[in-house]
Amino acid sequence: MGTFLLLMAEASAVGGELAEGGAEGGFGLNTNILDTNLINLAIIITVLFVFGRKVLGNTLKTRRENIETAIKNAEQRAADAAKQLKEAQQKLEQAQAEAERIKKSAQDNAQTAGQAILAQAAVDIERLQEAGAADLNAELDRAIAQLRQRVVALALQKVESELQGGIADDAQKILIDRSIAQLGGEV
């Protein structure tokens, strides 16, 4: 601060000399570069110090507040992101557990359905076998009945042909004796 006052005092002295030179002969030009630079620097520094301190202070204060706000917002977003990540991980774990439960349930249902289909197939096969056996027995009974009818028809045809030709006396006597014996009589 003392240096600044010294510079101000020198600037005033130089300014006074310029004023005296201008009063003597009018407007004068100082050709001493070092003196003019010091005066210019002193004026600029004074203006900057007086007016710039407030502007610079306000700018720095605003910038600091903006940085603090940005840091707080970033920290808040980071905390929110961490919270959302934790929630998402919990939801993922729940979804994986649910998917595993659904998969196990589907496997159990598939196994149960497979067993039910196999059991139904076994019942259907047995029913078809029984139906086939019943059809086979019915066909066999029908074939036997047809054979009996045919045998009876052939036997009747033979008997008729023999009856038309007449029965021999010996065969007639044997037939009569046999019929009487069956009725319970004696010959």
From Swiss-Prot:
Pfam families: ATP-synt_B
KW Transmembrane helix (keyword) present: yes
CDD domains in UniProt: ATP-synt_Fo_b
GO terms, molecular function: proton-transporting ATP synthase activity, rotational mechanism
GO cellular component: plasma membrane-derived thylakoid membrane; proton-transporting ATP synthase complex
TM helices/strands, residue ranges: 32-52
UniProt subunit comment: F-type ATPases have 2 components, F(1) - the catalytic core - and F(0) - the membrane proton channel. F(1) has five subunits: alpha(3), beta(3), gamma(1), delta(1), epsilon(1). F(0) has four main subunits: a(1), b(1), b'(1) and c(10-14). The alpha and beta chains form an alternating ring which encloses part of the gamma chain. F(1) is attached to F(0) by a central stalk formed by the gamma and epsilon chains, while a peripheral stalk is formed by the delta, b and b' chains.
The family this protein is said to belong to: Belongs to the ATPase B chain family.
Functional note: F(1)F(0) ATP synthase produces ATP from ADP in the presence of a proton or sodium gradient. F-type ATPases consist of two structural domains, F(1) containing the extramembraneous catalytic core and F(0) containing the membrane proton channel, linked together by a central stalk and a peripheral stalk. During catalysis, ATP synthesis in the catalytic domain of F(1) is coupled via a rotary mechanism of the central stalk subunits to proton translocation.
Name assigned to this protein: ATP synthase subunit b
Species of the source: Trichormus variabilis (strain ATCC 29413 / PCC 7937) (Anabaena variabilis)
